[in-house]
């Protein structure tokens, strides 16, 4: 049973009360170590991620279900299909080890099959969101030297215009109709081609090129190896499942996250299949459809990003509680949840365990994971370091390593950390420093129990008269106002002060909340130097699909509003 109270984080300006450093922190090296025992990862240098996945034994039956049609395949059938499709891709399409193949696909039961088939051949997969523009697709195709793409009907023309060979992936699961309407895809999937030479794939070989979000700069191709994918499967997905009394094979997961993103891919294309779990795949997230799918398929686990959690909470308020009876856990990642949204969820679905986690594309989604118990809950935290992971909190001004309770840039190290950025040694050298430490760019701190809290991005820090202000701190104050639905804060240049905090506020309809009211409210809650100096009322806060605030868009709105008055 999930508790309904929130843990209040320690004052980040004060150090932990421990007289001696806790066992998981070294004051000499500044290294935080996972509180969990290290796990033994496969040592065979010639082990590929697909072989590692299917080497795990379990008692699971159904592997994948299409949420719309109910079409399903078992775990046994999945392994056979992956081998069969790999043979078709090898013989019909001529794909060989080292070839780069793009998946520009929406969520479907076919997605994991195609991905696993390709990397089992030693091919390198780069994924793209199917809603990508022609310019975005062109950039990635060019940078990755893509020669072949699997895509849905609406993107065939875009990819063909770029000189890429295209395989149109059917949206149907009626194989008789597929054989007539899409014979090439049917041939790859269903015909028998016999022997395929097994390539020598090393754990250090690149398996995937996943693109970072690019919310704070140009998107970059992240090189992930078979070793990285195995680490994600073992340290993120399988380890988390091992912490609960019920077996992973009894869980039914709802896959509404994009499978083309590292969060969805690590869970639904790799890790959960090794546990024998059942995955119900939705083409795209829709709150109304989610309610029906949870009830129909008795979903037990639902990984989400913040916008999905907010939509689910809102929809759940108008639905009979019995609909969500099967739901055990909702896990959120990609962006921190505000306290207001956490409280709202816990009040609406008190029987559901809510956890947050932390990971990056650059760490193959391995980082931290939340754990709640009857005695201890840290809903605002992103959890404890995963096994085999280490961290440092670094003062971004002096470079010194900081103890628990102090804010600094989070560095992480472990087997999930990427090989580097594609064709960008300068960016790689700036991000991976001092013997494989990944600089995350996130401001964070560990509390006295080893739980990690993400505060903000270093690039977003507002510098007011020499003081440093984290926008997320002010955003937390703003959304605590009963008449404010959502808020975001960014910096505006100021000759006298350097920068000043500007708040973008979404207020409740039919309220008379004024800019002055907002400024006064924040001023009553924070130190004088942290006050909001300007307020802009907006209808919505611009955010990425994963819920990250698009601060570049806020600055654009701010610039346009200033220009319009000149």
Swiss-Prot record:
Keywords: ATP-binding, Ligase, Magnesium, Nucleotide-binding, Peroxisome, Ubiquinone biosynthesis. Its cofactor is Mg(2+). Residues 357-421 are annotated as: SBD2. Expressed at very low level in leaves. Its EC number is 6.2.1.-, 6.2.1.12, 6.2.1.27. SUPFAM superfamilies: Acetyl-CoA synthetase-like. Residues 1-21 are annotated as: Disordered. InterPro entries: AMP-bd_C, AMP-bd_C_sf, AMP-binding_CS, AMP-dep_synth/lig_dom, ANL_N_sf. Pfam families: AMP-binding, AMP-binding_C. (E)-4-coumaroyl-AMP binds at residues 263, 334, 356-357, 361, 459, 463. GO terms for molecular function: (E)-caffeate-CoA ligase activity; 4-coumarate-CoA ligase activity; 4-hydroxybenzoate-CoA ligase activity; ATP binding; CoA-ligase activity; trans-cinnamate-CoA ligase activity; trans-feruloyl-CoA synthase activity. Disruption phenotype: Cannot use 4-coumarate for ubiquinone biosynthesis. ATP binds at residues 212-216, 220, 356-357, 361, 442, 457, 548. CDD domains: 4CL. A motif (Microbody targeting signal) lies at residues 564-566. GO terms for biological process: ubiquinone biosynthetic process. Residues 286-356 are annotated as: SBD1. It is an enzyme of class 6 (ligase). CoA binds at residues 284, 465-466. The keyword Ligase applies. It comes from the Eukaryota. Both substrate-binding domains (SBD1 and SBD2) are involved in the substrate recognition, and are sufficient to confer the substrate specificity. Belongs to the ATP-dependent AMP-binding enzyme family. Contributes to jasmonic acid biosynthesis by initiating the beta-oxidative chain shortening of its precursors. Acts as a carboxylate--CoA ligase that can use preferentially p-coumarate, ferulate and caffeate as substrates and, with a lower efficiency, (E)-cinnamate and 4-hydroxybenzoate as substrates. Involved in the biosynthesis of ubiquinone from phenylalanine by activating the propyl side chain of 4-coumarate, and possibly trans-cinnamate and 4-hydroxybenzoate, for subsequent beta-oxidative shortening and the formation of the benzenoid moiety of ubiquinone. This is 4-coumarate--CoA ligase-like 6. It comes from Arabidopsis thaliana (Mouse-ear cress).
